Amino acid sequence: MADPIMHLQVVILSLILHLADSVADSVNVDGVAGLSITLPCRYNGAITSMCWNRGTCSVFSCPDGIVWTNGTHVTYRKETRYKLLGNLSRRDVSLTIANTAVSDSGIYCCRVKHSGWFNDMKITISLKIGPPRVTIPIVRTVRTSTTVPTTTTTTLPTTTTLPTTTTLPTTMTLPTTTTLPMTTTLPTTTTVPMTTTLPTTLPTTTTLPTTLPTTTTLPTTLPTTTTLPTTMTLPMTTTLPTTTTLPTTTTLPTTTTLPTTTTLPTTTLPTMTLPTTTTLPTTMTLPMTTTLPTTTTLPTTTTLPTTTMVSTFVPPTPLPMQDHEPVATSPSSAQPAETHPVTLLGATRTQPTSSPLYSYTTDGSDTVTESSDGLWNNNQTQLSPEHSPQMVNTTEGIYAGVCISVLVLLAVLGVVIAKKYFFKKEIQQLSVSFSNHQFKTLQNAVKKEVHAEDNIYIENNLYAMNQDPVVLFESLRP
């Protein structure tokens, strides 16, 4: 039992060690924005594939890979800024990032593939990109020209001690005072890198002027906003309230005169008690007066147009030769066209008097030639029919007679219609008055028995109702 347990423990420990994937120590790399930075990564053993991952590496692969290789060549590059400038055949897979930015800061992982489970090599690199450094040259002014006159003036009194020439070598310290070229080394001792820490704060202060111009742009935008009062022409569009003439269309309430049409109830429709005078059917003798249409036999006098036969006869009295013009026959003649033989000096020919298809032109010998629209095909002569003034008078008489007869008929019809209208109106008035005044007398008359000997006459006279109905019924009472 102990051997399987020990074997299981060994397997678990080996798995824990392999899960570590032989992770190397994490490396921190600092850089400056705008420059290139190299993230180191090398491996040993056989040449194999590898990948660079943005962020920590997972157990099996590079989930956010930015560069992939097959061992000798780059197979994938997320951006052109990512380059492997090392010798891949010598297992140098260091990553170079060109033109770095502050956003490039973060964790990078170099993963090298090895055979076997959990044998991949992983190197985690923490990259920190700082802002770019601005170097400000420091100019130092050394006023050495002021010291040279002072040294020359001081040496002149010392030249008076010529006997003590031994002091001259001591005065040879003047060349030592010519350390002015030594002061020229000051540009070399411009320890600018030492003072570069100060400019790192200075750019932060110099950013303030950069922000100040941005604030100066605000006044430039303010004048642009002053153009908004120029857009205050919108109050000029307040002419829209002048369109408040629409309330003047409130004259529609003046159309409330429609309630004045409520005078219809004042038509005293309760006076429709006339239907209560339905006793009029008791006077159903009034339909007996419908014999008035029998008087419409007057239109039978329309036989008057038959009198037009009188005007169609023309006496056959020849007249001397004269020019004749064609006369159009009356269109009102309803009878068939009559032909009259006319005897002239030449040959005779009968022609219908009512035919509108012939027109004649006469020459001096009373011969008639057919017009260009005639029906004859040969050039033959024809005598024109004889027309007398008596025939013209008869046609005029026909017109006059027809007109007079029509007027008479219209007058008769007008009289009949007017009489019928007034008669009907009078009958209605009489029936209403009779029903109102003699209703009780009629009831009394109905109660009495009517004997066979009573002389009751119902005259079929159209104009009998012109009498007073009261007098009529008084005379009929026993």
Swiss-Prot record:
PROSITE patterns listed in its UniProt record: IG_LIKE, IG_MHC
Q: In Gene Ontology terms, what is a biological process of this protein?
A: positive regulation of mast cell activation
Q: Where are the sequence repeats?
A: 148-155, 156-161, 162-167, 168-173, 174-179, 180-185, 186-191, 192-197, 198-201, 202-207, 208-211, 212-217, 218-221, 222-227, 228-233, 234-239, 240-245, 246-251, 252-257, 258-263, 264-268, 269-273, 274-279, 280-285, 286-291, 292-297, 298-303, 304-309
Could you tell me where the Polar residues compositional bias lies? 348-370
Which residues are the signal sequence here? 1-24
- What keywords would UniProt list here? Cell membrane, Disulfide bond, Glycoprotein, Host cell receptor for virus entry, Host-virus interaction, Immunoglobulin domain, Membrane, Receptor, Repeat, Signal, Transmembrane, Transmembrane helix
- Provide the Ig-like V-type domain boundaries: 25-126
Q: Which loops or segments lie on the Extracellular side of the membrane, by the record? A: 25-397
Give the span(s) annotated as Disordered.
187-303, 320-339, 344-370
One GO molecular function term? phosphatidylserine binding
Instruction: Kindly list the cysteine pairs connected by disulfide bridges.
Output: C41-C110, C51-C62, C57-C109
Q: Which GO terms describe its cellular component?
A: cell surface; motile cilium; plasma membrane
Superkingdom assignment = Eukaryota
Stretches of the chain found on the membrane's Cytoplasmic side: 419-478
Q: Where is this region: 28 X 6 AA approximate tandem repeats of L-P-[MT]-T-[MT]-T?
A: 148-309
The residue ranges crossing the membrane are: 398-418
* Glycosites: N70, N87, N379, N393
Q: In which compartments does the protein localize?
A: Cell membrane
Specify the protein's topology with respect to the membrane: Single-pass type I membrane protein
Query: Its biological function?
Result: Phosphatidylserine receptor that plays an important functional role in regulatory B-cells homeostasis including generation, expansion and suppressor functions. As P-selectin/SELPLG ligand, plays a specialized role in activated but not naive T-cell trafficking during inflammatory responses. Controls thereby T-cell accumulation in the inflamed central nervous system (CNS) and the induction of autoimmune disease. Also regulates expression of various anti-inflammatory cytokines and co-inhibitory ligands including IL10. Acts as a regulator of T-cell proliferation.
- Which family does the UniProt entry place this protein in? Belongs to the immunoglobulin superfamily. TIM family.
Q: Subunit details for this protein?
A: Interacts with STAM. Interacts with SELPLG.
Can you name this protein? Hepatitis A virus cellular receptor 1
Q: Which gene encodes it?
A: HAVCR1
